[in-house]
């Protein structure tokens, strides 16, 4: 049915395909003129309308799609959109890439809080650091009587910058507090190794980190209930589904069928936290060479910032330090259960 008319429309495929490039989305007036700091380009609908979403409003995103569905390209779209919006002083990333070949392209950009994380243990550590950073930021907001990071930037930081010279070393400026976006490219690999720690870390951040400018983008090619648990789903209302293998997988990610019928190669169903039903669109296409060109440009025109998180390699030593936001350790067997040692002794004696 056609809305507003007593007619029925039949969709016919175009005889010639048109490529939806990321550049056409980033040059859209809606994207260029928007004041939203974390606006990202999603794609174009069947009518040619461009779709954008504000990560600050989402405030977290769950992405699922099988191999070849365009999941990795979609993640690149989101990252490049954010890089076009904000510089390293206003936006920082923590990237987790167990596959080691997708997000490592961004290893040299100054936006990274730490080099791209490839090990499951370090991913858990990064989530623990983010939780401590979240608590610290809440203390900062409380001390300045600000409701959220947007209010803090507008009423505290911008006001101080208008009244003072940033180069004046005698004045102590309020903390800048950049937005932090945590991107995990393959949730299933880490969930296999540390299911309880990963779920707890994600849920804690998803419940509370929105107000302090920390956001999660999680992707997986296996959207089963073992990977996308009920707690994770309940706390991440924004979903982006590419082609999946079965209707069960579609219901896991969207709570509705449909994603199993998508065509692949960026054909997407997006359901935001404020949407009653998913919207179908074609995600923008971006090549590996284009990603490398953007990275080279950013590295050339920006000074490298010191890593805010340094993750050590040893298992038994202090393995992580930060620039004033606390430290965190590798997860160990002793973290799993207080009675683990006693149970182990009982099994040995038996």
What residue ranges belong to the model's regions?
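Conserved lysine of the Walker
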Residues: 71
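P-loop NTPase switch/communication element
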Residues: 56-59, 83-121, 125-126, 231-232
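The conserved Walker
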Residues: 67-68, 220
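Hydrophobic positions on the alpha1 helix immediately C-terminal to the Walker A/P-loop
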Residues: 74, 78
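Alpha-helical transmembrane segments of multipass membrane proteins
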Residues: 81-82, 190
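P-loop NTPase motor-domain active sites and their immediate coupling elements
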Residues: 5-40, 44-46, 50-52, 57-58, ...
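Short beta-strand
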Residues: 1-2
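Residues at the beta-strand->loop junction immediately N-terminal to the Walker
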Residues: 64
């Amino acid at each position: 049915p056609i809305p507003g008319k007593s007619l029925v429309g039949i969709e016919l495929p175009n005889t010639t395909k048109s490529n939806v490039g990321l550049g056409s989305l980033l040059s859209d007036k809606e994207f260029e003129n928007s004041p939203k700091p974390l606006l990202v380009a999603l794609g174009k609908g069947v009518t040619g309308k461009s779709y954008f979403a504000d990560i600050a409003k989402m405030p977290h995103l769950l992405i699922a799609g099988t191999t070849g569905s365009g999941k990795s390209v979609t993640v690149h779209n989101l990252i490049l959109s954010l890089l076009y919006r904000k510089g390293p002083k206003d936006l920082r990333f923590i990237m987790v890439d167990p596959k080691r070949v997708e997000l490592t392209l961004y290893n040299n950009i100054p936006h990274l809080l730490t080099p791209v994380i490839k090990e499951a243990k370090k991913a858990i550590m990064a989530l623990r650091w983010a939780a401590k950073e979240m608590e610290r930021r809440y203390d900062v907001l409380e001390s300045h009587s600000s409701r959220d990071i947007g209010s803090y930037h507008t009423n505290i930081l911008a006001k101080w910058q208008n009244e003072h010279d940033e180069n004046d070393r005698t004045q102590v400026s309020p903390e800048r507090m950049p937005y932090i976006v945590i991107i995990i490219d393959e949730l299933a690999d880490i969930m296999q190794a540390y299911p309880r720690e990963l779920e707890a870390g994600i849920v804690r951040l998803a419940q509370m980190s929105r107000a302090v400018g920390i956001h999660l983008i999680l992707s997986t090619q296996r959207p089963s209930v073992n990977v996308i648990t009920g707690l994770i789903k309940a706390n991440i209302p924004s979903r982006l589904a590419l082609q999946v293998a079965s209707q069960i997988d579609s219901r896991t990610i969207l709570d509705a069928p449909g994603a199993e019928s998508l065509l692949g190669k960026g054909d997407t169903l997006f359901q935001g936290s404020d949407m009653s039903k998913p919207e179908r669109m074609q995600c923008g296409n971006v090549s590996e060479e284009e990603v490398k060109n953007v990275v080279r440009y950013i590295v050339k025109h920006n000074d490298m910032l010191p890593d805010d998180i340094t993750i050590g390699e040893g298992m038994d030593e202090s393995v992580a330090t930060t620039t004033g936001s606390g430290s965190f350790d590798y997860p160990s067997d002793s973290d799993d259960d207080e009675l683990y040692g006693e149970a182990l002794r009982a099994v040995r004696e038996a």
